């Protein structure tokens, strides 16, 4: 698949046996595009990200990005995480506890200098000398995002990137990511449990249920939400 920037984006077919079901998902994401993965807890969303990152290995299928295969089961090809050119913001953040915020970002930089600019872009430049345990969960989340972007990835994988952020900082990060995408053609695959975000987002949304793409699941959630908003209150008004 080829995006508007003239470079091939992500095309993958992931099949992986899990404890209670088999993940079987076709996924595409063009350069400069964001794809949201949503669905009930335990439906295979994080496993999908881990397979794309190379941390988990699919039982069968393929992962193709930027004109090359990262994984191809039929030939046994499997490129490791360090050679995929990806950024991965996991729920655990992945910051080094003995390093300052700035040192964590600098560690991921391909070129010397520039860590402060990343931190300033997400509003935490004043925390650059703090260590992860000295800042809040939302601040750690933003520091980890900077770390993920510092290596200038071609594909960014985000697992609940806004979960610890307030509304103001969510908007700040969304605008920052949009600017990065516009400048670089970065492809983003993001997991969200925020139903409102999934239902109102302008980007493409894939709902997963028991490892399968489930567009009906998202429509059921939309219908339930609308029904709740239309339900009469005790005073006779609607929500």
Identify the residue ranges that each predicted region occupies.
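Catalytic Walker B motif of ABC-type/P-loop ATPase nucleotide-binding domains
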Residues: 156-160
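Helix N-cap at the start of a conserved alpha-helix in ABC-type nucleotide-binding domains
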Residues: 167-169
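Conserved ABC ATPase "signature" region
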Residues: 68-73, 112-128, 178-179
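Conserved H-loop
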Residues: 185-191
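A short, proline-enriched helix->beta-strand linker immediately N-terminal to the Walker B motif
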Residues: 150-154
